[in-house]
Amino acid sequence: AELTFLEERTIGPELGADSIAAGQIACIVAGLAILVYMVLSYGLFGVFANVALIINVGLIFGLLSIVGATLTLPGIAGIVLTIGMAVDANVIVFERIREELKTAKGPARAIELGYEKALSSIIDANITTFITAVILFTMGSGPVSGFAVTLGFGIITSVFTAIFVTRSLIVIWFSRTRPKTIEV
C-alpha cells in the first residue's frame, strides 16, 4: 500500500520545552491535590502516606539520575502513573485497616491484619504493571522506552515505600503513643 503524506510540519525545541514545563506544572498541581486528599481522607495515616510518597518521588529521581536518564514527557507520565499506584497501595491498606478495626482485637492487630490482607493485592498489581513496563522497554523505542524505565523504577520504589516506609512510620508512631483507638 502506498503512503500519502497529508501534512508535514517541523517544530522547534521550544514546543518540547513548553510541553515539559506544562507537564511539570500538572504534576505539581496533581501532587498537591493528592497530598491534601490523603490527609483529609486518612488523617495522620494520610500524613504518613504523604511522607512515603515524597520519599518515593525522591527515590525515582535518584534512580533516574544514577542511570543518567533524561526526563521527558513520557517519563513524567510514568511518574504520574507511579504516584497513582503508590497512593492506591496506601488506600488499599488503610481501607483494609478500617475494616479490621471493626472486628480485630485492638488497633495494633487491626494494623497488622490490614497490611497482611492487603499485601497480595498490592504485590499482584505491581508485578503485572512491572511486567508491562519490561515488555514496553524491550519492544518499544524512544519515548515508549523512557516511559517504561520511569514506570519500572516507580513500581520498585512504590512497593518499597508503601510496604516498608509507610508501615514503619505507622509502627514507630504506634509504639511511641500506644493509642487505645485509632482513626484511619
Which sequence ranges carry the predicted segments?
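Hydrophobic alpha-helical transmembrane segments of membrane transport and translocation systems
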Residues: G62, E99-V184
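Hydrophobic alpha-helical membrane-associated segments
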Residues: A33-V39, M85-A89, T157, T161
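Short helix-coil transition sites and intra-membrane helix breaks within transmembrane domains
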Residues: A26, V47-A49, M85-N90, I123-N126
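Extended, hydrophilic extramembrane loops/domains of integral membrane proteins
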Residues: A1-E7
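Residue-level signature of catalytic and energy-coupling elements of molecular machines
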Residues: L15, I34, L63, V91, ...
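Interfacial segments of transmembrane alpha-helices in multi-pass membrane proteins
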Residues: A17-T72, T138-G142
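Small-residue-enriched core segments of transmembrane alpha-helices in multipass membrane transport
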Residues: V47-G68, I79-G84, F147-A162
